[in-house]
Amino acid sequence: MVHITLPGLLLCLCLYLSVAPANPLNAHARVSDTTAFPLPNEGHVVAHDPSIVRHHEHFYLFKGGIHIPVFRASNLSGPWERLGTVLNGPSLVQKQNQRRPWAPMVTQWKNRFYCFYSISQNGKRNSAIGVASSDSVEPGGWTDHGPLINTGHGPGSGVYPFNVSNAIDPAFFADPITGQPYLQYGSYWKGIFQVPLAEDLLSVENATHPNTDHLVFLPKKKPKPNEGVFMSYRAPYYYAWFSHGQCCHFKTQGFPKEGNEYSIRVGRSTSVHGPFVDRDNKDLLNGGGSVVYGSNHGKVYAPGGLGVLPGANGEPDVLYYHYHNASIGFAQGDARLGWNYLDYVDGWPVPRAPSNPGNSLQPPSSVSLQIVAFLCLVILFTL
């Protein structure tokens, strides 16, 4: 007869806790166990809607949050040092949530840095995209110029496309062929748009009647969860990237049906103006978009809020994004930075598996728990 002792039970419990997830997977979250997508390289930093620029052998990460936090690292996998914030106080945009801008996008243009950011509320079109600029990418020298575009209310909000869209999730792109700068933006409602910017990036070119490109739309579906646009170029194609699905608020709004959470999608075109089509030649204005990266391995959930860093020093392009680690949690503050190098197959971007397994997120495994069960049996029979 086996005599189960209290010390034996306590030791078994300690062994179990040492390998069990810190925050067990919520029973309502359906995290795909597909291996069709590679695991991410871990960024080792909490970040929702990250924007990353490379400058002087360092990476600078900007994320949504109070006054737009700024981090610096010499490697995309960290360690990241928090430097401060872009803004010194509330945004000059006169709308709610002035202290906590969303989804910043930072770029360098003609020896000056620009930070485009969103001011909005969940589920509202009364939004604005603001812009700040600085001679330095680091905190301390940024000047807030206030709103660039308004939707819902405010100057210019009655002009197309601002009268049908939602001014959040800004992205900047300079056409490498013509040099023309563009702003891409949009979320839900009528989808994602592109407008040309003036040379100083502080206003829309021909603001009362901008030369508008409609890039992404879901014409027959409600809701219309396309947002988080990013434009990149690799000759001969322009790539319109976006996030599709429910991004967040899983604790308050619940988990969507599997496959309806965030995923990263793309279309391509030989013109910056489009039309953009996916692998099946479906127009992004008709609900198209090839899935480049989605939930995977029972561990990675709802990747999105993406950007693409052009390759440097012979390295490939980098796809970076935020995602939720199912072993950690699904709150807004649990979103983490992930990244993968990109290969291009027949002109389509494909994320590359991490080359350093020690830096990648590891899928859940039952092996550790099986070992614990065996050790517990040994302990119970010997104590």
Swiss-Prot record:
A lipid is attached at N356 (GPI-anchor amidated asparagine). Glycans are attached at N75, N163, N206, N325. Keywords: Carbohydrate metabolism, Cell membrane, Glycoprotein, Glycosidase, GPI-anchor, Hydrolase, Lipoprotein, Membrane, Polysaccharide degradation, Signal, Xylan degradation. CDD domains: GH43_AnAbnA-like. The record marks D169 as: Important for catalytic activity, responsible for pKa modulation of the active site Glu and correct orientation of both the proton donor and substrate. Its main location: membrane. GO terms for molecular function: arabinan endo-1,5-alpha-L-arabinosidase activity. Belongs to the glycosyl hydrolase 43 family. Endo-1,5-alpha-L-arabinanase involved in degradation of pectin. Its preferred substrate is linear 1,5-alpha-L-arabinan. This is Probable arabinan endo-1,5-alpha-L-arabinosidase D. The lineage of its organism: Eukaryota, Fungi, Dikarya, Ascomycota, Pezizomycotina. The gene is abnD.
